[in-house]
């Protein structure tokens, strides 16, 4: 009988000691030292999202919406990019017919005074100049073509007209492959975003987007654009 009591007492004492050790030493230790990898992963995701949001905000006012009514009554919509603060805009030649009613949407304002300065069917680029308030004409920087990397994170921004009113739209992806003549992304989009600029995550211009019949987004590279506009 005495032996059983001693056994119970010893078990009780060991249990108390284990409880004190866990409560006073182990538990505070794990509270003070949380699982760092999980927190680091969350911080990386938050930082990446913040970088994209900042880049979008940086380039938003440089993106131009284009809406044309042709002589035959057809409506054509697309986008372009402001390249100088005196009103130079570059977009795709296929967007601008030689005749029609043209309207350019810049930072929420409609501009109808313009002049086509240069057109190149081979590169599918057109340069025009609009008359607008200088404060409304904001530009983005040009990305160095030689620094573009496979797998690099990129985004496009364009203007769509779902109900005749312009709305800016963003989509993101990566550089799938590239040559001197084009940059292929993994982005798929509607052809209403034809002419939309492609940017890197710094908000620098990489090219202007052509969207094929399957929705694949391919950009005319910045090297061809700069050579065409002379900048």
Residue positions per predicted region:
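N-terminal Sec-pathway targeting helices
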Residues: 1-15
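Active-site region of chymotrypsin-like
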Residues: 3, 7, 59-62, 66, ...
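Conserved positions in beta-strands of structured domains
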Residues: 67, 81-83, 115-118, 176
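N-terminal activation segment of mature serine protease catalytic domains
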Residues: 23-88, 92-94, 100-101, 105, ...
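Beta-rich catalytic cores
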Residues: 76, 124, 194
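C-terminal cap/linker of serine protease catalytic domains
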Residues: 15-43, 48-52, 56, 135-139, ...
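Small-residue-enriched segments and motifs
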Residues: 80, 112-115, 173, 196
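Conserved active-site neighborhood of the chymotrypsin/trypsin-like protease fold
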Residues: 84-165, 182-183, 214
């Amino acid at each position: 009988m005495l032996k059983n009591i001693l056994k119970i007492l010893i078990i009780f004492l060991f249990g108390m000691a284990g409880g004190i050790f866990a409560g006073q030493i182990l538990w505070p230790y794990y509270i003070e030292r949380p699982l760092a990898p999980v927190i680091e992963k969350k911080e990386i995701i938050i930082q990446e999202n913040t970088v994209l949001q900042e880049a979008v905000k940086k380039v938003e006012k440089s993106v131009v919406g284009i809406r044309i009514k042709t002589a035959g009554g057809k409506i054509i919509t697309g986008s372009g990019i402001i390249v100088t603060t005196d009103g130079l805009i570059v977009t795709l030649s296929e967007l601008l017919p030689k005749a029609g009613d043209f309207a350019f949407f810049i930072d929420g304002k409609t501009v109808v005074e313009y002049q086509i300065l240069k057109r190149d069917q081979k590169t599918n680029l057109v340069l025009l100049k609009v008359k607008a308030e200088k404060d409304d004409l904001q530009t983005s920087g040009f990305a160095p073509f030689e620094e573009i990397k496979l797998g690099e994170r990129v985004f496009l921004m364009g203007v769509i007209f779902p109900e005749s009113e312009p709305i800016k739209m963003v989509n993101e992806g990566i550089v799938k492959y590239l040559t001197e003549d084009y940059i292929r992304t993994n982005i798929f989009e509607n052809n209403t975003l034809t002419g939309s600029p492609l940017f890197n995550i710094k908000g620098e211009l990489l090219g202007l987007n052509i969207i094929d019949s399957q929705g694949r987004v391919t950009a005319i590279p910045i090297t061809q654009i700069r050579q065409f506009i002379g900048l």
